């Protein structure tokens, strides 16, 4: 393993942490409707649980309503039940074979709770990134111990890893700020 391998590996892992954080943020409801909100809803499809996107078409009807059109008529009730039980605080209404999912307006108190959740998720993501930095620095120290690189090379590589860490932590902070602004916008 070389210094380049360590740096490349840690950067890829940090990027994956950012992607996972973005996915977590997408699940947090803001006042506006977006189809990503229902991505993790699982529907009972002939005995097996499948993502809602595999049994229905998701569209935005307007800024506050998601339209869900199951591909099979007999799935309408099951899809509606799955949305209702997904613990998202949503109350779907069926009109024929179209399920309308209106987004209720968030109360001020709920907005504050959601910003706390966003901050907490952000901290978790930053801790994960810092843990990756620690792992990379330990790998570099092992390379020095095994006499594969000099201490100067290790120090330079450590500085590079720190720069990567700072960059990714700043990206998390930016995502948190953006999501908080989105939540607090009435």
Swiss-Prot record:
Top-level division of the source organism's lineage: Bacteria
Entry's Gene Ontology BP terms: cytoplasmic translational termination
Subcellular location per the Swiss-Prot or TrEMBL entry: Cytoplasm
An annotated Gene Ontology molecular function: ribosomal large subunit binding
Pfam families (UniProt xref): RRF
GO cellular component, one term: cytosol
Key word Cytoplasm present: yes
UniProtKB keywords: Cytoplasm, Protein biosynthesis
InterPro entries: Ribosome_recyc_fac, Ribosome_recyc_fac_dom, RRF_sf
Function summary: Responsible for the release of ribosomes from messenger RNA at the termination of protein biosynthesis. May increase the efficiency of translation by recycling ribosomes from one round of translation to another.
Family, per entry: Belongs to the RRF family.
Name used for this protein in its record: Ribosome-recycling factor
Organism expressing this protein natively: Burkholderia cenocepacia (strain ATCC BAA-245 / DSM 16553 / LMG 16656 / NCTC 13227 / J2315 / CF5610)
Lineage, uppermost ranks: Bacteria, Pseudomonadati, Pseudomonadota, Betaproteobacteria, Burkholderiales
Gene it is expressed from: frr
């Amino acid at each position: 393993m070389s210094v380049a391998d360590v740096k490349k590996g840690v950067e890829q892992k940090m990027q994956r942490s950012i992607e996972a954080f973005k996915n977590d943020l997408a699940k947090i409801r803001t006042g506006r409707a977006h189809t990503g909100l229902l991505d993790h809803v699982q529907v009972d499809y002939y005995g097996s649980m499948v993502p809602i996107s595999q049994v229905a078409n998701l569209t935005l009807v307007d800024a506050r309503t998601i339209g869900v059109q199951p591909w099979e008529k007999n799935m309408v009730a099951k899809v509606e039940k799955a949305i209702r039980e997904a613990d998202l605080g949503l109350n779907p209404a069926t009109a024929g074979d179209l399920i309308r999912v209106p987004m209720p307006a968030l109360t001020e108190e709920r907005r504050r709770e959601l910003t706390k959740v966003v901050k907490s998720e952000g901290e978790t993501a930053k801790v994960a990134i810092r843990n990756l930095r620690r792992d990379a620095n330990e790998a570099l120290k092992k390379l020095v111990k095994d006499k594969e690189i000099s201490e100067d090379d290790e120090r330079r590589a450590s500085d590079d890893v720190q720069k990567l860490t700072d960059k990714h932590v700043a990206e998390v902070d930016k995502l948190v700020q953006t999501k908080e602004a989105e939540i607090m916008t009435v």
